Amino acid sequence: MKKLIILAVSVFALFTSCQQRPQVFGVYIDGTFEQFLKDLDKEPWKCPINIDTIQHLSESEISIKAFSTEVIDLNEDSVKVDSIYITIELEKEKIKQFSYTLDMSETDFKAIQHAYERIYGSVKYHDITEYGNYCSWMIGKTSLWLSYDFAEQQTKYEYFIY
């Protein structure tokens, strides 16, 4: 049975040059979420979001409150993001989907898209509809989707693990 966990956190996105995935900084944790961070990295305040690492976690290990500040390295000017929502969908202790949404402009979305192109290579799929701007990459067995909702003015990241 799938369990949907929504974790609301505040975030700052600092755009600087770097060739790695986004990293979470300044994490204030509660319960087993602390162990979750320690398992990913011995320095929980500088812990990368690593989809491959968190696949094995069970529902009880991850349904915990947390507050974090995130740095997204993009070689752009600093931008403050008001909120971020992390969604983790679990089935039989394996994560099927990992997504989070940021309140930001389409300009910020395009900056993130260009940064991901530098990190992951050319976009596999790209489309612009009346509802939003969509693009995706394939990273091994993981599909990374980046979309911008015109109505909500939100950028959403989604990881689908196959």
Q: Which role does the model predict for each range below?
A:
Residues V11-F12:
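Repetitive helical segments and hydrophobic/amphipathic motifs
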Residues E61-I64, V81-S83:
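A general secondary-structure signal for short beta-strands and their flanking turns/coil
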Residues I64-S78:
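Extracytoplasmic/periplasmic/luminal assembly and interaction segments
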Residues D82-K92:
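A structural motif
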Residues Q19-S63, E91-Y162:
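Non-cytosolic coordination micro-motifs
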Residues K2-A8:
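Sec-dependent signal peptide recognition
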Residues F15-S17:
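C-terminal motif of bacterial Sec signal peptides marking the signal peptidase cleavage site
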